[in-house]
């Protein structure tokens, strides 16, 4: 079962909903609020967690800067950004039988792109 690290920009209701759905998820805001993106990646790597974020910078860090982007990254792109909608979208996404490890995934409503992380 995959483990996830939710970036600070993921709404608290989405993190709480994922926890209620028995998803192993840690929220950056709970453990290290305010840390920079490099530290977020290091934390995800150290704990073996897939990063869940709205921040496109993590794609740039992985593909253009060659930084290790954790065990994997899921870039959330739901149609609506209301916290309740994001919560439902996130829980439905994380409960899919997908191997997130080693991939950069872009999740949109009705579309999921999964690209292997650069070596």
What are these regions (language model features)?
Residues 97-119:
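Charged phosphate-binding loop/patch that engages nucleotide di/tri-phosphates or the phosphate backbone
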Residues 2-49:
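N-terminal first-folded block
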Residues 15-16, 37, 61-64, 85, ...:
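Short glycine-/acidic-enriched loop or helix-start segments at secondary-structure transitions
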């Amino acid at each position: 079962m995959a483990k996830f690290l939710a970036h600070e920009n993921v709404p608290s209701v989405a993190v709480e909903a994922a926890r209620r759905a028995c998803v192993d998820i840690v929220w950056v805001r709970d453990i290290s609020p305010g840390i920079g993106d490099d530290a977020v990646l290091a934390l995800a790597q150290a704990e073996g967690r897939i990063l869940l974020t709205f921040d496109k910078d993590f794609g740039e860090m992985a593909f253009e800067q060659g930084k290790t982007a954790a065990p994997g990254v899921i870039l959330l792109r739901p149609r609506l950004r209301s916290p309740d909608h994001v919560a439902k979208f996130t829980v439905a996404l994380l409960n899919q039988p997908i191997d997130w490890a080693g991939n950069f995934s872009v999740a949109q409503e009705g579309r999921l792109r999964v690209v292997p992380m650069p070596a």
